[in-house]
Design a protein with these regions (language model features):
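A short-motif feature that recognizes glycine-rich, charge-decorated loops
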Residues: 1-186
């Protein structure tokens, strides 16, 4: 192999390294980071628009038993009348609140689609779990979880003050059931 051929092949990696280095220097000088256009930015699409961190009080009712949880700054969640709760129970409360903010309903059944149907058809005449969420200024949202859909993958839910019925992923209702169980075992 001649010296010219070897030189012809070896200069390409050097040029590519110089171009990459120049690109990095340009990014440092301008302060710009490369934008990942293939990634989608997160957007909360739940029924509660306020950030979960703003929630300071949660009231959960199941089978006529109400439990009230308060967020106490650094101490985390406490159960009114029961004091501190386990870290696992606190995670259930935090996740349940977060799901109200982040989990978009799978479907919304408008009132006009429900003509001739009663709340009992969705288990909302006697909800499995009812949750009321408050921030420092007052109530944010009150939701009622009914029965599962026929496939068992989702659950019917209504929101106080709003018409219609929502179909929400089953894990949302399961988390609220876990919160209710935490309060009722005390």
């Amino acid at each position: 192999m001649s010296a010219a051929t070897r030189f012809g092949r070896n200069w390409r990696p050097g040029i590519l390294a110089l171009l990459a280095g120049g690109y990095l220097v340009a990014m440092v000088v301008t302060g710009a980071l490369p934008r990942q256009r293939q990634l989608i930015e997160f957007e909360a699409r739940g029924l509660m628009r306020e950030p979960p961190e703003s929630v300071v009080r949660v009231e959960v009712t199941r089978a006529g038993v109400q439990s009230v949880f308060l967020r106490d700054g650094a101490k985390g969640w406490t159960l009114v009348g029961g004091g501190a709760i386990t870290p696992e129970a606190a995670r259930h409360v935090s996740m349940a609140v977060q799901f109200l903010n982040t989990s978009e309903p799978l479907r919304y059944l408008a009132q006009k689609e429900l003509v001739g149907m009663t709340p009992a058809a969705f288990g909302l005449d006697r909800p499995v779990v009812t949750a009321r969420v408050h921030n420092a200024q007052g109530p944010l949202i009150a939701v009622n979880f009914g029965t599962d859909n026929p496939e068992g993958s989702a659950q019917y839910m209504s929101v106080d003050g709003r018409d219609g019925v929502y179909l929400i992923s089953r894990f949302v209702g399961s988390e609220w059931s876990a919160v209710a169980a935490t309060g009722s075992t005390r």
